[in-house]
Swiss-Prot record:
This is Thymidine kinase. GO terms for cellular component: cytosol. InterPro entries: P-loop_NTPase, Thymidine_kinase. Belongs to the thymidine kinase family. Its EC number is 2.7.1.21. One of its GO terms (biological process) is DNA biosynthetic process. The active site is at E87 (proton acceptor). It comes from Streptomyces avermitilis (strain ATCC 31267 / DSM 46492 / JCM 5070 / NBRC 14893 / NCIMB 12804 / NRRL 8165 / MA-4680). The keyword Lipid metabolism does not apply. It catalyses: thymidine + ATP = dTMP + ADP + H(+). Homotetramer. The keyword ATP-binding applies.
Amino acid sequence: MPELVFFSGTMDCGKSTLALQIGHNRSARGLQGVIFTRDDRAGEGKLSSRLGLVTEAVEAAPGMDLHAYLVDQMSKGGKVDYLIVDEAQFLAPEQIDQLARVVDDLDLDVFAFGITTDFRTKLFPGSQRLIELADRIETLQVEAMCWCGARATHNARTVGGEMVVEGEQVVVGDVNRPAAEVGYEVLCRRHHRRRMTSASAYAAAISPDVLPVTSA
């Protein structure tokens, strides 16, 4: 039976790499798929991983009807055996509903990959709808690590190396951006709550100890 499967995890846990691997394995068996993505770090219409792998994809723009797009492709003779959706957290809830229709009405497997929560620990609307509708939810087994060595469970947005907790939910950035730019870092819950990034921890580590002042 076709399924809607949601592969979730923090940044840096290999979601896009797994998406590319699933596509490779299926294409090696003669199957043809459609890849959707939104706001990939490599640019519009690209699916990329941090390992340097990149492939062409269809940009799932806001307001785009994903189900209608596939019906149109298939009615023109296009062969579609499965669907891969990367950065699924950025999709609107109604687009997730369309993915469920693809599974139920077109009998296609849909593999969606995304981050569950944003930098404020709030669910992305797309991820929330996937949790509500998916036949299966898989947590990625490659664990991202906080700077302290603990398992990273939270995504932090940084500006100049400092963690911020206000702003637009979606700002495209990366974990490898220069410190002065908007970037992201994965943290354990403890250090996310304390707003302690690797940069702030390093600054604290090299700060000279303040000696107590005593009166003569």
